[in-house]
Amino acid sequence: MDSSTLSPAVTATDAPIPSYERIRNAADISVIVIYFVVVMAVGLWAMFSTNRGTVGGFFLAGRSMVWWPIGASLFASNIGSGHFVGLAGTGAAAGIAMGGFEWNALVLVVVLGWIFVPIYIKAGVVTMPEYLRKRFGGKRIQIYLSVLSLLLYIFTKISADIFSGAIFINLALGLDIYLAIFILLAITALYTITGGLAAVIYTDTLQTAIMLVGSFILTGFAFNEVGGYEAFMDKYMKAIPTKVSNGNFTAKEECYTPRADSFHIFRDPITGDMPWPGLIFGLAILALWYWCTDQVIVQRCLSAKNMSHVKADCTLCGYLKLLPMFLMVMPGMISRILYTEKIACVLPEECQKYCGTPVGCTNIAYPTLVVELMPNGLRGLMLSVMMASLMSSLTSIFNSASTLFTMDIYTKIRKKASEKELMIAGRLFILVLIGISIAWVPIVQSAQSGQLFDYIQSITSYLGPPIAAVFLLAIFCKRVNEQGAFWGLILGFLIGISRMITEFAYGTGSCMEPSNCPKIICGVHYLYFAIILFVISVITILIISFLTKPIPDVHLYRWCWSLRNSKEERIDLDAGEEEDIPEDSKDTIEIDTEAPQKKKGCFRRAYDLFCGLDQDKGPKMTKEEEEAMKMKMTDTSEKPLWRTVVNINGIILLAVAVFCHAYFA
């Protein structure tokens, strides 16, 4: 682009005050207010219309959800503000390769719906660590995975979403970051605590619609501004900043020029920033961990009313995952074209002036596009989109983390906890998570913004592969036992954490200032490292399992793929142990409800209604009804017609995935 085209954009964004003032108009503010009112209304509707007074109701929505809100919720839970900021930023810096991360999910959601979820449902579990406890016996794997998952939620998912949201809010509104985050977390926690999983899924559905509408509008404006797709491809390769030297210092050319392979997903296996073997195989391992074993994702599928709905919601999510390439990655690249000096800055002092960080400003590509390009009203809609993505991800994490804590950790501390106590504990833990999240903000704020998205992916590469290996072998290899699974997890964790600590001790570096980390440790791309770690974990699990005593088939009926259709009676490995919710505590609840009760005051009745703790409402289930409910929670049957329909759609989705990868290869 010529300098005359660039200069107005640069001038407009030199000072932050005009950006703040742009959003302060009646149209934008009205849209934002309406958005919050509608979201709270949906949350309150879910609060009054769903059963939140039981563990199954609060954490699994009573297995009564239909496919389309679950599919939307899966997408919204995955697409956080980190995607809008991180994907667009990576697109601005390096082209479309990161879109391959999104398209990889098209295959894994089919694996989730057709292979993993049927096993989870037959196991009758609420959490993923609980499945491993029932599959292997013992409690150490369950507790280990629960604690590790909670740490991953806090230090990767929550921190990334909060940081990304803060970037946008600070640029668009000029609010103090802590005030903005506190308000968002407060509203998010409010309808998560009060509504349970049903409220989260319904609000996610609303926010998915908002995200898609707003993103399509912005993408249309962006492509119109740049002159269409052909012009976009041509101008991106010429989007080079003019200020590349300062005195005697001149930046290296590769640090500020677009990559020659910017419009290719598959890149050189040695020199590529996203090597194609890592993208195919390494990313598949990370995606297996995220899509098939992560509590946030699987919990939504477990809430579906039957298996056909599970498969349909996975298929819908897969089709939605086609969109981020066009709605996030490419708009980020267009932002570099329109605001080259700002987004593609290379000199530390220039980047510091534009976005407050010396390592680069690609992370503000999407927010800048929104603030500079959108008209009044639509700008407010896009701010709502960013808040929607932030809040939907946080609600998913809060609900799933509270499930992990309540079902896998709290029940070990309080073995005879009543249903009501479990409900309160789950809600209080959400408040604890919020406190930790706010305390973590300064650390996230001080992180190198240019490295945030890679930071998230690398953490997953270091900690996720052993978990993926254990779940994969637990389902497909019945010979694997508890000793093999546990020590495979421990060895994999030690190797991964060693690489992570070493890398971050030396610093991840940047194009301008490469890291001094030894090549033998940090020279291996994190996607290649994920493959190596996965293979080591699998070998360790298999060797130890084959050297120790196997688990008899009588304990594995319907919990392994080879025994999934067995009709024989199963003896659970944990049958002799106390269940998460012991019978005597259930009896206590029943006795309490039958005894004469004092009339509750207005405040107490309102409190019980607000938190879903009014268990007296409605008749108690008989033993026969309880058995019927248990059968429903573990039923994987399908009607032949709908099984055929969803299977055909699954095949079409896989074909679309192959086409997309081939077209942009």
Swiss-Prot record:
The record marks 460 as: Involved in sugar-binding/transport and inhibitor binding. Glycans are attached at residue 248. The record marks 43, 300 as: Implicated in sodium coupling. The keyword Isomerase does not apply. The chain crosses the membrane at residues 25-47, 67-90, 96-117, 140-169, 177-193, 203-221, 276-295, 310-331, 376-406, 423-444, 452-477, 482-504, 526-547, 646-663. The keyword Protein biosynthesis does not apply. The cholesterol-binding site is formed by transmembrane helices TM1, TM7 and TM13. Electrogenic Na(+)-coupled sugar symporter that actively transports D-glucose or D-galactose at the plasma membrane, with a Na(+) to sugar coupling ratio of 2:1. Transporter activity is driven by a transmembrane Na(+) electrochemical gradient set by the Na(+)/K(+) pump. Has a primary role in the transport of dietary monosaccharides from enterocytes to blood. Responsible for the absorption of D-glucose or D-galactose across the apical brush-border membrane of enterocytes, whereas basolateral exit is provided by GLUT2. This is Sodium/glucose cotransporter 1. It comes from Mus musculus. The lineage of its organism: Eukaryota, Metazoa, Chordata, Craniata, Vertebrata. The gene is Slc5a1.
